[in-house]
Structure formats: structure tokens, C-alpha cells
Amino acid sequence: KGAEKRFDNQYHCLPAIVVGVQHLNEGCIDVQPIIGRLYEDGTTNFPPAILSVPIVTPQTRNSAFILPVQQGDNVLLIFSQRDVSAFKGGARDPHEPETLRISDINDAFAILGVNPLVESVYEPSRHTLPHSLDDVVVVHNLGTGNENEVRLKSSGDMEFRAKNFKFIGSTATFEVDKITNMGDNIVEGYSTLNGGGDTQGI
């Protein structure tokens, strides 16, 4: 009985739904595990909501790929074998855990990128823009009129698709053999042309 009780209080990996994003600026979300533990007598025990769970997304200390997270999104929870309270508080070097707990529900991390199969982002019909499974794609606002994307084609081409496209910077350099403009060209300020001369914009 004691071993069974101890196992009941240990967690390893569970899907969950996001129930709170008020601490998203800190890289944490509130989640509710969605699969309970079924016992031989037919009863089920559902874990409680877990607050302030750190998000796992591609990042280093100085670079990151940042995704918006909303209530209703799904995540995959993994649970540390040791108490991560000190680590969450900023301890980056080797240290002793603050408690003796093992695989505890309070030591969860939330991995983004888990969805039911019927909500797969690989499904072309879920995309407003044309989609190929052979391409590498960064997409936002999936399936809406505001869908935009950066697409690395299997052919070696690159496509940017958006309602409006803006470069912000002090300079922009294009080292290409040819630039083809399929629409109107509006210049605000001065445009210097190779071969001499300035063209004044509006």
C-alpha cells in the first residue's frame, strides 16, 4: 500500500490544456492535466491544475523562437525527477534540491507543439494559404484570413506571404542578379540608382 501510494504521487509525462496565461511574460502558464489515473476498481483520479509551469520552446539565454500561447492550447507536461524550485528561481549552477520530492506534480515543464491528431498543423486543409508537406514553414494565424508565413520550398525557393510586408532597419542590401516588381513601386525619400543620379520620391 505504501509503495502504491508513493507511485500515485509521482508523475512522468501527461498531456494538458492551458487554463491560464497571466504569467506568460515570465515564461509560465497554468495548465490542467487532461487524463486521469484509472484504478482497478473503476474509479478515476484527476490531477489538479498546476500553476506557473515553465514553457519549453527553442531558446537560449540570448535568442528565442517565441510562440503566443492561449487558453485552450494543448501542451505536453514532463516532470523533473528532482525539485526544480531553485532552478526556476534562477539557480543555474549545480545545487541541492530544496525538498526530497521525486517526480512531483509541482516540478512540471510544458512542451509546446502537442495537438490531437484531428488538429494537426500538417493537414493542408487547415491552412488558408497553399501548403506542401515538403516545405519548411513558419506560420501564424493558421486557417484565418490573417494567415501569414515564411516558407522554405523544397525547390530551394523562399516565399514570404502576408497582407503587408515591412523591412525595418537602417539599411537593406540585396545581392541578386535581378529584382522583378509585379506591382506599383512607391518611393518615399531618395532612391540612388547605379550608373548615377538620384530619383526623388513623393
Residue ranges with predicted function:
Residues 1-163, 168:
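Hydrophobic packing positions characteristic
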Residues 153-202:
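Intrinsic-disorder/coil detector with helix-boundary
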